[in-house]
Amino acid sequence: MTIKVIVVGAGGNLGHHIVSALDDDHRFTVTILARASSKSKFPSHITVHRVDDYYPELEVVEAFKGQDVVISTVTTGAIQRQKTLIDAALKAGVGRFIPSEFGHDTRNGNASKMLPQMYQQKREVVEYLRAKQNDGLEWTAFVTGPFLEVAIENFLGFNLSQQHATILNEGSDRWSATTRATVGLAVKNSLLIPEKTSNRYLFIDTVTASQNDVLLALRKMTGTEWGVDYVDAEEQKRVAIEHLSKGRLIGIPMLMRYITCVRGYGGDYLDYETSANEILSLPVRNVDEVIASILKG
């Protein structure tokens, strides 16, 4: 018997990697729930249910009927709408809900205070799921750190085209990150061992490294020296908060770099939580190998 999974937000930054991992495994039947206005293209053999952009409960319940698992990969702007999806999953008789938690450890109070619109709202969704688990809806939340191949140039401080790095403090604090393909594999494998992954957070990574480790790998893989600016992390945080106070969104990636790369804000989650890599059969990779694959595209 196949496991029936419906993915919400499959056209986004992460969704198609999860769909691909599931679709490549004959043990799963994949369906997609998409917004009516979505322009995303999906494989022709996958059933797509389109609903109003605000996810009306009646429409969503109908789409969820017969599904074993709902996986949500909705964007930050739709995080709170997951409560409607959760209620619909319960009414449709779905067995498990995986929320769009993928990223930093949102339980960290320091990070939530800094970017509540990203972290606090995600945590509230998991708490909503906790309250529903006695009603028969299991959940699994993934802490992955940033998606490495996206974040490395986006906000982690490495300009690949100019071969220049911006390093916070001495660059020695270690943090964890995961590639999107590994996230997809982790989600798929978690559904194959439901008794070990029910009603809990799963902490995974592709690499755990410091900014200095990444810089060393980039120098090695490109064969060039790279320019470096070492900057004060607290000053960067102050500037980022000032940007946000004036409505400048550039402050968000600056704070995400701080949260990731400065100890105590949850980027170092594998220092205080047990890795789920082994139970999820995730591949072991070193920093050089991962950076080389990112540079190859």
UniProtKB/Swiss-Prot annotation:
User: Could you tell me which CDD domains the record lists for this protein?
Assistant: PCBER_SDR_a
PANTHER family listed in its UniProt record: NMRA-LIKE DOMAIN-CONTAINING PROTEIN-RELATED (PTHR47706:SF9), NMRA-LIKE FAMILY PROTEIN (PTHR47706)
Q: Which GO terms describe its molecular function?
A: oxidoreductase activity
NADP: is it a keyword of this entry? yes
Q: List the disulfide bonds.
A: none
Name-wise, this protein is: Oxidoreductase aprR
Q: Give the metabolic or biological pathway.
A: Secondary metabolite biosynthesis
Q: Which Gene3D superfamilies match?
A: NAD(P)-binding Rossmann-like Domain (3.40.50.720), UDP-galactose 4-epimerase, domain 1 (3.90.25.10)
Q: NADP: present as a keyword of the record?
A: yes
SUPFAM superfamilies cross-referenced by the UniProt entry: NAD(P)-binding Rossmann-fold domains
According to its UniProt record, which protein family does this protein belong to? Belongs to the NmrA-type oxidoreductase family. Isoflavone reductase subfamily.
Q: Which UniProt keywords apply?
A: NADP, Oxidoreductase
Q: What does this protein do?
A: Oxidoreductase; part of the gene cluster that mediates the biosynthesis of the asperipin-2a, a bicyclic peptide that possesses two macrocyclic ether rings consisting of 14- and 17-membered paracyclophans. The pathway starts with the processing of the precursor aprA by kexin proteases to produce 11 identical copies of the hexapeptide Phe-Tyr-Tyr-Thr-Gly-Tyr. Macrocyclization of asperipin-2a may accompany an alpha-hydroxylation-dehydration sequence to give an imine, which is readily hydrolyzed to yield putative ketone intermediate.
UniProt xrefs under Pfam families: NmrA
